[in-house]
Amino acid sequence: MKILANDGIDAKGQAALEAMGCTVLTEKVNQDALAGFIQNENIDGLLVRSATTARKDLIDACPNLKFIGRGGVGIDNIDAVYAREKGVDVFNTPASSSASVAELVMSMLFASNRFIYQAGGSMPVNGEETFEVLKKNYGKGKEVKGKTLGIIGFGRIGQSLAEYALGCGMRVMFFDRSKTEQTVVLSINGSPVEVKLNVSSFEEVLRESDFI
């Protein structure tokens, strides 16, 4: 099987595919030349991220294409329904970005509570002359340990965020229309620790959370 990873692919992923006997091409093909390349090179599978689109015209122009894979969660750049109607399988990697998004949320939580953005802008410019004033202003940060984090929607990203928050000693509440409870599994030095969380109402989350 011949696969074009048009938006790149991690070396481990490429090696795994090649170990299964696939030929993986990683060259970037411009969107307007993509259909011709797929046909001329007898490409069986197309892997994309967000830069490349796979619309109806591409699908129609590539009748031998067997699948389109999206390295990420959203498939807005793929006409997935039409592709499946044409017998082209479409899949994504729903858990691939959960930890990344959760880490970004936690980094913003720490940064906002410790005035990191403001200090990073002010200290290099005025730190020498007004250090004592800035130190006093930016020394009023808050610890997140012991605070309550409210999460609206408790899918993969919400659960991953809960793992980080619980690991920091936070209390976690969540609201989700389709869940009544959820067990979050933390890995502590390689040992699993299960934490059972019960759903709260939307109003309870708003009322009791320090951060949402």
Give each language-model segment a name.
Residues T53, G74-N77, S96-S97, K135, ...:
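Residue-level detector of alpha-helix initiation sites
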Residues M1-F91, R207:
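An N-terminal-biased, well-structured beta-alpha scaffold segment characteristic
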Residues K86, P94-T148:
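Phosphate-binding beta-alpha-beta segment of Rossmann-like dinucleotide-binding domains, i.e.
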